[in-house]
Amino acid sequence: MVVRKRMNRFLLIFLVCLSAVCSLYSQGDYENGDIYLYGETHGVVRILEKEIDIYSGYYQEDHMRHLFIEYPYFISYYLNEWIQSPSDEILDSLYEQWKGSASYNPAVKEFFEEIKKHCPQTVFHGIDVGHFYWSIGEQLREDLEENGMSETEEYSKVIKSIEQGEVYYETGDSLFREQMMVENFIEEFESLEGESVMGIFGSMHVTNKDPEEKNRYGNLATGLIQTYGDRVHTESLTSLAANLLEDPMRVDTITIDGIEYEASFFGRQYLKNILPRFIYRDFYRIENAYDDFSNKKKNSNVLPYNNYPVQVQTKDVFMIEFCLADGSLERQFYRSDGNTWNDMPVTEQFLL
């Protein structure tokens, strides 16, 4: 089990890393190699398919081999082991450990499988802070120690990624996360000695590319442009998600008031930059449930149809699961009675 470090250690790590990032931002000219960043809405099939198409083009036509991803170093280490393996055992293990995250989505797993199938010489570079440091990160640390690799560069990167994850999950500091992503990206990119790369990240990390117009936290693209200038190219793919989903990403079974229901999952929306109290919300449509909940007392909360990633019909019932800033989960239930608010069709929250 990982023992949580004292806050003074977190502060020390933060200051050291921040100093390193500031130094990297101000470095001089670099030669060769462009950076192509694509912003996504996580887990959307149309976007994942487009990303495969774009990367395959770079891979086949431009001989690009390096794909930067929104995962920590230790996950990309395992992905690189997996892509060279004849089996999918490593990916299967990672996928099971991604439960509870946006990566636990069959479309995401299929994305990696397609990369392995069509672009088998790909090298993944994970540059995010240490998400899953308590499980996957510690697992790799132990694996390397058992194999006598505790003095290697790989081991140092694993420890660094774990420590970044500890700081981020202790403080919730999004500025720290963005700055670490910039530092980690630059470190990996510079090690390639002039090769061009593609990166896939959530749109909030990519779309704000003007250093003079920083968003609330700054972001990855801003930091990279400060270092590499017009060698950084950004494009948002989020418009591909504008069309509402027709089919669920998966179907779960949940129990409400002692009764089991099928719950169709329609995706996750990240809220931290919009509503600081929340990290994200997950949308579930509870199938064939309206009659069971139509008489439940409503409160005054409404949620317009345009908040949902799927077409809403009268007599639909939804469960929205919020992840709060402290990591706790809160479930809210809404139903569509065909009512409007300010001339907008809305769902209304009801109480269990």
Show where each model-derived region lies.
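Bacterial N-terminal signal peptides
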Residues: 12-21
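Compositional signal for N-terminal targeting/processing segments
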Residues: 24-352
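N-terminal secretory signal peptides that target proteins for export/translocation
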Residues: 1-7
